[in-house]
């Protein structure tokens, strides 16, 4: 049994148990409230952990956005048989409705595994 620390607003979880050592993917939200808006090292990201809670990788950027390597609000995760990662995002509620003018944003992205 272990306790995993140093996560900010985890909102998505996928446990890959297809290998001998399970890997856990966790989607985190970035700062969105006045109380944490200026806090350092928070970001909209996907972290990958081993079964003991050691972070193996971090995907994403400190800033939310639609550019390559950025997330808006990861809320759903899935991994296919090739190892590609699918990230579902709550982009309208978190960001799109607040833009001037409001607009639709990406709500699903695929991250292709490179061999």
Each language-model region and where it sits:
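Eukaryotic scaffold repeat domains enriched in small/polar residues
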Residues: 1-115
């Amino acid at each position: 049994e272990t306790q995993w620390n140093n996560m900010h607003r985890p909102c998505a979880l996928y446990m890959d148990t297809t290998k001998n050592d399970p890997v856990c993917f966790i989607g985190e939200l970035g700062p969105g409230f006045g109380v944490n808006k200026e806090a350092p090292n928070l970001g909209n990201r996907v972290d990958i952990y081993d079964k003991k809670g050691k972070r193996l990788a971090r995907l994403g950027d400190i800033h939310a956005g639609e550019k390559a390597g950025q997330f808006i609000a990861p809320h759903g995760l899935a991994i296919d048989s090739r190892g590609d990662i699918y990230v579902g995002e709550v982009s309208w509620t978190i960001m799109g409705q607040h833009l001037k003018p409001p607009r639709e944003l990406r709500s699903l992205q695929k991250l292709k595994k490179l061999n």
